[in-house]
Amino acid sequence: MNSNWTDTVKTMTGFRLTTLLAVSASALTLAACGSAEVASPGEGDFGGGGGGGTPPPTTPPPGTPAADCPTGFANVGLVAGGTLRACQLPQQINGALTVPLRAGTVYAISGRTSVGTDQGVDPAAPIAGSTQGILTIEAGVRIFASGGSDYLLVNRGSQLFAEGTAANPIVFTSRQNVDGATTESSQGQWGGIVLAGRAPQANCQLTAPVTCTGTVEGTAAFYGGNSQTDNSGRLRYVQIKFSGFEISTGNELQGLTMAGVGSGTTVDHIQVHNSSDDGIEIFGGNVNLRHIVINGADDDGLDTDTGWRGGAQFGIVTQRPAGSTSRSAGFEFSSAPTSVPLASRYVSQPKMANWTLVGRNSTTDAHTVAHFDSGTDATIINSVFTAASTSLAGCMAINDADTGTSGVTFNSVFMSCTLPYRPSNAVLSAAAFTAGTNNTANGVSTLTAPAAGTSLSNQLLTFINGANENAVTPVAAATTYAFFQNTTYIGAVQNAADTWWQGWTCGLTAGATC
């Protein structure tokens, strides 16, 4: 989310969780399909006909669309120049639904596609009349959407199991991308994915929120509770491309939004490519992340708010050089609401290890690579912040006295920018950075890019460590946070032989176009 970089606080009514997306009632009024557990998404969006049928008895030849759709999915016609059958998911998913990998088939969502209905804050006492949904997506499946109001929402008490593999990632993308009509600057062509859980968050004036409920930005969905280990499912080897949509000023859908998501949820090997807002935004909760790639976000790479107390290890952020949101950052970490005194505020406590942030290579207003405000109590270890832009206001900024009081901890962090700190906050920022161990404020980057042939030319892809980065002694990550793994290096990628980011991503290696 793009913060007001001249203001130092966010008000209770303005910290971006109360403005709701007005979803039409007609989008939620669904005809029956098959059984009462699965509702029909309606007639075809692309001129196709008919409802769901049974899978074809034989596999169609390559380039030939499947004859029909699986039971429970609506046949909405052909896409990709007539080579793929488009099968639309129900807009309301109650009970269990599996999206199977089938030859000649791509899947679609239209409008708000909800998994379950909100079951409330207490897993032991779900809201009367609420329903659980469990959506399972098989490895290699592609799902597209056609507009900004199309998004996938997993409600409290429901789960999403989207588990791809390195060779067969699951891809969420836009209709334009399926039709071959996107470029490396395309963005904002559909909404995104929203997970809403029952873990604590700060949208109440309580030190320890127990039954605190908030509304997820860009939706009318509720999140929050007191279940730190809440489980919203598993996401592994997933691409989310060309997403993000501004509903109104300060109220947007991101590539991936996680609100009140608990530590029982698995988020591992996720790429968000060209989101028109943030790549990933986390509101509260205790979810942990590992192996994250965020490239080309128009706003922030990773944005956290309202009391997130989890960790993330092994992450790459590469920012696009220019866009409508000029004041973006690789990290923007906040702790709204600031209407609560700091001593009573349920502040965010993000813990980050082995990240490489590559800021905008912009000639004007590139701003900062990492930004901390509103009392965020962050810990950053074994990481690299860099940007080549001479317009950069600074590698890092601690924006206000509350954040200086809470304390941002830096250990084994290597920064290489024209200025290490934003001048307006340099005293606070320098005090925090120099208090840590093994930190380098004015380093010379020796980061390198992947081998020639990458498909993204509109951003710097220099995220592989060189001699200067590898000369920094790392701290023991597992001592800082039990979720972390100890490493012998800082940054996301140690050297050319460190290939965790290859094979399942797009745009970063030759032949893997987005």
Where are these regions (language model features)?
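Extracellular beta-rich repeat passengers
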Residues: 42-48, 60-132, 146-157, 164, ...
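Bacterial Sec-dependent N-terminal signal peptides
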Residues: 2-8, 23-78
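Glycine-rich loop(s) and the adjacent beta-strand/alpha-helix scaffold that form part
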Residues: 168-169
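Catalytic metal-binding/acid-base residues of hydrolase active sites
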Residues: 142
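Sec-dependent N-terminal signal peptides
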Residues: 15-25
